[in-house]
Regions:
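Canonical P-loop GTPase G-domain recognition
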Residues: 149-154, 160-188
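Conserved G1/Walker A P-loop phosphate-binding module
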Residues: 1-121
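Conserved ATPase-coupling elements of RecA-like P-loop NTPase cores
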Residues: 100-103, 131-136, 164-170
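P-loop/Walker A phosphate-binding loop and immediately adjacent motor/lid segment at beta-alpha junctions
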Residues: 134-156, 160
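Inter-motif core of Ras-like GTPase G domains
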Residues: 103-129, 140-148, 187
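Conserved nucleotide-binding/hydrolysis micro-motifs of P-loop NTPases
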Residues: 94-97, 127-131, 159-164, 188
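Generic enzyme active-site microenvironment
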Residues: 90, 124, 156-159
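Conserved catalytic network of the ASCE P-loop NTPase/AAA+ motor domain
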Residues: 80-84, 89, 113-117, 128-131, ...
């Protein structure tokens, strides 16, 4: 029994060291990106909202995108060219879930860090989900908890092709009274 405890303790210590190493690597990469003065956009949203699919479409990447909870377990960053002269770093993040203690789950630590440090948040919403408004509120609560609620946000209403009747939306940009883009409707 004592030998088992010692082995378990050693494995836990080794895993903690690996986690610290990964955390340091991410911090180093983040500093390098920030030193390049390139704006960072983070895709945030409820789990299974289509963040990875949008990330793949925009960056021509091939990150895992499945119709299942937690298909994305780690953050991924790629350069996104907005024009020939302008590019940003786009980060795909782990989806949020209602009532999950985000601060207690180490898999979320990188996502929470990337989100809080982003210059712009692209809040991806699955408009086909019956509780999408509640999911938006859940994401907003997490953003407030981690101090990212003041980061400028653009709502990306996704999966509009699944809507019908009065809920149907056309793809395009939604603007406020001053003409500023506040949301976009897409299907990926």
């Amino acid at each position: 029994l004592e030998t088992d405890r010692r082995l378990i303790s050693q494995k836990i210590s080794a895993l903690k060291k690996q986690l610290q190493s990964v955390h340091k690597q991410r911090a180093t990469r983040r500093k390098a990106r920030m030193a390049g003065n390139m704006p960072t956009f983070a895709l945030v949203g409820y789990t299974n909202a289509g963040k990875s699919s949008l990330f793949n479409r925009l960056t021509k990447a091939d990150v895992l995108a499945k119709d299942q909870l937690f298909a994305t377990l780690d953050t991924t960053a790629r350069r996104l060219y907005l024009s020939a002269e302008v590019s940003v770093i786009l980060t795909d993040t782990v989806g949020f879930v209602r009532d999950l203690p985000h601060k207690l789950v180490s898999a979320f630590s990188a996502t929470l860090e990337e989100t809080a440090l982003a210059d712009v948040l692209l809040h991806v919403v699955d408009t086909g989900h019956p509780a999408f408004e509640r999911q938006m509120d859940d994401v907003d609560k997490v953003l407030e908890e981690i101090g990212a609620h003041e980061v400028p946000q653009l709502i990306v209403y996704n999966k509009i092709d699944l809507l019908s009747g009065e809920a149907a939306r056309a793809a395009g940009v939604l603007r406020d009274a001053a003409g500023r883009a506040v949301a976009v409707n897409v299907s990926v």
